Amino acid sequence: MVGSKMAASIRERQTVALKRMLNFNVPHVKNSPGEPVWKVLIYDRFGQDIISPLLSVKELRDMGITLHLLLHSDRDPIRDVPAVYFVMPTEENIDRLCQDLRNQLYESYYLNFISAISRSKLEDIANAALAANAVTQVAKVFDQYLNFITLEEDMFVLCNQNKELVSYRAINRPDITDTEMETVMDTIVDSLFCFFVTLGAVPIIRCSRGTAAEMVAVKLDKKLRENLRDARNSLFTGDPLGTGQFSFQRPLLVLVDRNIDLATPLHHTWTYQALVHDVLDFHLNRVNLEESTGVENSPTGARPKRKNKKSYDLTPVDKFWQKHKGSPFPEVAESVQQELESYRAQEDEVKRLKSIMGLEGEDEGAISMLSDNTAKLTSAVSSLPELLEKKRLIDLHTNVATAVLEHIKARKLDVYFEYEEKIMSKTTLDKSLLDVISDPDAGTPEDKMRLFLIYYISAQQAPSEVDLEQYKKALTDAGCNLSPLQYIKQWKAFAKMASTPASYGNTTTKPMGLLSRVMNTGSQFVMEGVKNLVLKQQNLPVTRILDNLMEMKSNPETDDYRYFDPKMLRSNDSSVPRNKSPFQEAIVFVVGGGNYIEYQNLVDYIKGKQGKHILYGCSEIFNATQFIKQLSQLGQK
C-alpha cells in the first residue's frame, strides 16, 4: 500500500486467501517439509481473472496444481486426484459442477465459491451428490468472498467478465428500468462486500447525494449492518487470515460517481502505466504487443502498421515497472537507456574476466592476477541469473516503450497532452482549438474528439450555437463520429442544473527542452521532436474530494456528502461526528469506471502524507477508447 507498510496490502490479503484455498482451505505454510499434495484447479472465467494477476503458473505448481482447467472446457476424468473448484455460484456453473459429480471426474471435490452461494443452489449440489453417490467425495464447500480483482498493492477493480453490466453506459442509460438498476447496484455491492471481508475491516462510508454512488452506499451499509448483527456468522470477527488487522483505526470508504469528472478519462496522459493502458492493449497487468513493421510508409497522423503478437506481464517483481510506472514518459525512455548501458558494462566485465582467465604464461604477475580475478569471476558468475533477469526486463521495457513512442510520434500525443492540460487548468492557449482539430498531421479522429470533449466539459460557458456548428463541421471533416458529443451535451445540461462543473486546479506542464541524454545517437529511442514535459502535481477532482473527507476539511464540494457507519445501532443518516480526527486509511471507489490517470494522481498525492494509505477501486477500468465507445452508444439513444 502507498505509505508505510503498517498493514497487509489488499494484494497480499487476497493472495494469502487464494493460497489457503488452494491448500484445501488450510493456511499455507511457506517452506513446509514434504511434497505438496498434487491436485487440479478448475475455475471459470471469473476465477481465472482473479487468480492470474496474483499467482504465476510457477507459483501454482509450487502449491501442487498440476493442471488448471476452465470449468466449461472438455475435461477428461482423473479419478485419483482431488479437484479444487473456484467458480461463481451461477446457474450454469452449478449445473456443470453437478454433471462433474455424476461423471465421477475426480477423487474428491473442494468447492469454493467466489461469492456466497444461495441455500437453494447448495441444495441442488447436495441432491446431485446424493444421486451420484458422491456425498463422501465432496470434501469441503466454502464461500470465499473474493469477488474482485486486485491489480496493484493499492488498486482493485470489480470484474472483467460481464463488465458491461456495471459499466458507465449501463448505469447512465436513459431507458434503464428500476429492476435493472437494482441488479447493477447489487452486483457492485456484492463485490465491495467481498472486498471488505478480505480486508477485514468495516469502513465509515461517505458518498455524494442523488447519484448511483449513493445507491451503492445505502445498499452496502445495509449489507454490512446485517452481517455485523448476526454475531455468530459475522465475517468481521477475528482476523481469519492471520495477517494483522488493517489498523486500529477504521478506514474511510469514499464512494464517488464517475459523473463528477468526465474529462479525466478522456485525457491524453504522459505517465508510463497510463500511456501503456491508453495506447496499447493492456489488460489485467498483461500487455499484448504486435511487433511493429515501422511507420515508414504510413501517412503522418496514422497509427503505425502492425504484425506478430507478443505478450508481456508487468508484475510487482518487475523492479523497473514498479519504479517507473508513474514516471513521465521521457524519464522512462532515459532510464531504459541507462539500464541498458549498465547491463552492457556488467556483461563486458564478465567477458573481460573470462579472457583474462584464459591467460597463458607462467610469470608471477599473471598468476597473482589470476587468483585475484578468480574471486571476481566467481562473484560475476553468481550474479549471472540476476544479469539475465535484468536483460529480460530491459528487452521487455525497450519493446513496450518503443511501441508507446511510436504512438506518441505518429499521433503527436505530447501536443495533445500539453494542450488539454492548459484547457483543464484554464491557462491561455497558444493555438486555437480549431487549428488543432483541423491539423491533418495531428492525431486520429478519436484524439481530436477527446480533445474537443475535454474543452466542452471544462468550459464554464458552453460555446455558442454558431461556434459549436463550426467545431462540429471541423470534427466531421476530420472523420469524427459526433455521437459522444450528443451525450456530453445532454450530460452538461443536466450537470449544470445539479451542480457546478468540476474544477481541475491550476496545473501547468513545463516543457524542459528536449532530453539531452535520450537524444544521443546511441540511444534506443529517437525522441526527436517529442517534448520533454515535466508534470506538476495537481489534484484531480477525485483526489480533491478524498483529501477533503480524509482530512475532515470543510468544503462546499463535500460538505453535504452523506455519512454512514454500519457499526452504529441506528441507521439514520447521522451528521458527521464533530470530534472526528482525520483518517489514516481510505478507499476511494468510483462507481461507473476508473482509469490509471486518477490512480496515479492518488498515488502522487499520498506520497507526501506520512503514514497514510489509500486504495483506489472502480467498477471497471477503461481507457479513453473504451470510454468514448460507451459515450457514443449513449449519444445514439
From Swiss-Prot:
Domain of life: Eukaryota
CC terms in the record's Gene Ontology section: cis-Golgi network; endoplasmic reticulum membrane; Golgi cisterna membrane; Golgi membrane; Golgi-associated vesicle
Pfam family for this entry, one: Sec1
Gene induction: Up-regulated in astrocytes upon reoxygenation after hypoxia.
Subcellular location: Cytoplasm; Endoplasmic reticulum membrane; Golgi apparatus, Golgi stack membrane
InterPro entries with a match to the protein in the record: Sec-1-like_dom1 (IPR043154), Sec-1-like_dom3a (IPR043127), Sec1-like (IPR001619), Sec1-like_dom2 (IPR027482), Sec1-like_sf (IPR036045)
Signal peptide region: none
Keywords, in A-Z order: Cytoplasm, Endoplasmic reticulum, ER-Golgi transport, Golgi apparatus, Membrane, Phosphoprotein, Protein transport, Transport
Free-text tissue specificity from the UniProt record: Highly expressed in testis. Detected at lower levels in brain, astrocytes, heart and small intestine.
Modified residues (Phosphoserine): 32, 298, 523
GO biological processes: endoplasmic reticulum to Golgi vesicle-mediated transport; intracellular protein transport; negative regulation of autophagosome assembly; post-Golgi vesicle-mediated transport; regulation of ER to Golgi vesicle-mediated transport; regulation of protein transport; response to hypoxia; response to toxic substance
Bilayer topology term: Peripheral membrane protein
Coiled-coil zones: none
Alphabetized GO MF terms: protein-containing complex binding; syntaxin binding
Entry function: Plays a role in SNARE-pin assembly and Golgi-to-ER retrograde transport via its interaction with COG4. Involved in vesicular transport between the endoplasmic reticulum and the Golgi.
The protein's assembly and partners: Interacts with STX17. Interacts with the COG complex via COG4. Interacts with STX5A.
Record-stated family: Belongs to the STXBP/unc-18/SEC1 family.
Name of the protein described by the UniProt record: Sec1 family domain-containing protein 1
Organism: Rattus norvegicus
Lineage of the species this protein comes from: Eukaryota, Metazoa, Chordata, Craniata, Vertebrata
The encoding gene: Scfd1
